[in-house]
């Protein structure tokens, strides 16, 4: 079985911790079994492995999130990067092409699609195993997971099973199919509250965005748009796929569709209010909480302390991107305000580690300076590169590494300073965990001002 995890999102609903470069699934805010903290994406992959579902995990993502996935999960997962952000159908089509043409998977192999940021329990993954079994037994071409609703939500699409109007008939209809599978009658997009109540009376399920099918089934659909011999060709012609969701392009057009019900813990931690319910503590980071706070949470990623006192139903979040103080009931509005911000992300994860912007200044003559603290994980390196519009000064503050400037190597340690003129090739590799301060001077100071010559050395 092959598992494709979808990783996307713009990262605005949990601002200031999330941003365009760090979506919610990468925030290490959940309690880990080892006593530390883990992100949503780390939690889901851990649960998949604990359930022994499969070792064959492929991420379908965009270029911005690729490095974060590798940084948090290592090299044990495959990552398929779409050339541009489109929608779930082209992303799934590209990942399926990767399995078929790059990994040489058989057409009969079962593929499961699921989101990477779901907050759920072990029964969820047992339900996925039932979906796989249903596909293997040819119950339907496409099998979905149906989440048993807990209230008439307007936030989710619904899956309506065929000829089911009571709990008894659900049980009766189940016996027709393998492992609690029900035939799907129709799909309904996000309804208003009254329509949602009617759907619940029809025993409809929330569409949880989990699909199972044979690889050959999906490749037949892919070939309707792009027929190539190699994955690289498909990747180059990616824009020929329609910009449309998998639900619209595949699920709603499928002639043979079944749904496997799931009843259990299932949450979208995409709002501050929902996330606070699962935080392991009322405060994370350098936070001091007074004695008279009520239902208040604080998360601080800055080095300076945050003190909370006399607050009720409030969320306080501080990061290099900004500071938010918000009533919990109004926390869903934060995305509207975050969308108005035009500043660059101040914190990013890369395949080699992380960086944080400390200062960004423009001087009277138009020259700019940008100061970062950069952390390289032991054994990792940044690419051999040059810049056309800026010089850089690096100051090593922790650890040891190997610095290269125009082909000349030298060992560096805490206290060493490295000057990099405009247009000169340079790189650094961490012998141990390595932290250095980078000061860029020039104009413009943008991430795109980089010409890479070698990624690994």
Spell out what each predicted region is.
Residues 2-5, 15-20, 28-115, 119-126, ...:
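Conserved N-terminal catalytic core of the sugar/cofactor nucleotidyltransferase
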Residues 213-418, 424-430, 445, 451-456:
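Left-handed beta-helix
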Residues 41, 95, 117, 159, ...:
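Residue-level signal for inorganic ion chemistry
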Residues 6, 114, 396, 439:
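Catalytic metal- and UDP-sugar-binding loop of GT-A-like glycosyltransferases, i.e.
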Residues 121-238, 258:
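Conserved core of the sugar-phosphate nucleotidyltransferase
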Residues 437-445:
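C-terminal structural segments of small proteins and small subunits
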Residues 11-16, 23, 447:
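Short N-terminal binding/cap micro-motifs at the start of the first secondary-structure element
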């Amino acid at each position: 079985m092959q598992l494709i995890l979808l990783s996307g999102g713009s990262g605005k609903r949990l601002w200031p911790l999330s941003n365009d470069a760090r979506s919610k699934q990468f925030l290490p805010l959940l309690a880990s079994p080892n006593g530390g903290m883990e992100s949503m994406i780390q939690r889901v992959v851990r649960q998949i492995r604990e359930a022994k579902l499969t070792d064959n995990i492929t991420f379908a993502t965009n270029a911005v999130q690729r490095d974060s996935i590798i940084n948090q999960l290592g090299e044990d997962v495959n990552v398929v990067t779409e050339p541009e952000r489109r929608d779930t159908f082209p992303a799934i089509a590209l990942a399926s092409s990767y399995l078929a043409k790059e990994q040489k998977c058989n057409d009969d192999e079962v593929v499961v699609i699921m989101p990477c940021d779901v907050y759920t329990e072990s029964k969820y993954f047992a339900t996925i195993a039932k979906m796989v079994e249903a596909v293997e037994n040819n119950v339907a071409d496409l099998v979905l997971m149906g989440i048993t609703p807990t209230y008439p939500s307007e936030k989710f699409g619904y899956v309506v099973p065929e000829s089911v109007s009571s709990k008894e008939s659900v049980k009766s209809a189940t016996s027709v199919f393998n492992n609690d599978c029900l035939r799907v009658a129709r799909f309904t997009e996000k309804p208003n509250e009254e329509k949602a109540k009617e759907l619940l009376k029809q025993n409809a399920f929330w569409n949880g965005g989990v699909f199972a099918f044979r690889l050959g089934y999906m490749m037949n659909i892919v070939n309707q748009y792009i027929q190539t011999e190699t994955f690289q060709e498909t990747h180059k012609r990616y824009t020929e796929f329609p910009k449309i969701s998998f639900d619209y392009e595949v699920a709603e057009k499928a002639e043979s569709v079944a749904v496997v019900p799931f009843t259990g813990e299932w949450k979208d931690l995409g709002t501050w209010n929902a996330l606070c319910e699962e935080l392991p503590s009322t405060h994370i980071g350098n936070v001091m909480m007074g004695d008279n706070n009520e239902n208040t949470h604080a998360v601080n990623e800055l080095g300076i302390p945050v003190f909370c006192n006399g607050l009720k139903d409030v969320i306080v979040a501080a990061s290099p991107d900004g500071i938010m103080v918000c009533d919990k009931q109004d926390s869903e509005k934060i995305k509207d305000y975050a969308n108005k911000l035009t500043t660059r992300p101040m914190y990013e994860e890369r395949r080699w580690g992380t960086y944080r912007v400390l200062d960004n200044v423009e001087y009277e003559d138009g020259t700019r300076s940008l100061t970062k603290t950069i952390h390289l994980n032991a054994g990792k390196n940044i690419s051999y590169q040059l810049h056309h519009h800026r010089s850089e000064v690096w100051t090593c503050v922790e650890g040891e590494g190997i610095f290269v400037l125009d082909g000349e190597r030298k060992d560096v340690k805490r206290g060493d300073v490295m000057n990099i003129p405009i247009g000169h090739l340079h790189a650094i590799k961490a012998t141990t965990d390595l932290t250095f301060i980078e000061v860029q001077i020039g104009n413009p100071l943008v991430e795109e001002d980089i010409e890479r010559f070698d990624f690994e050395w």
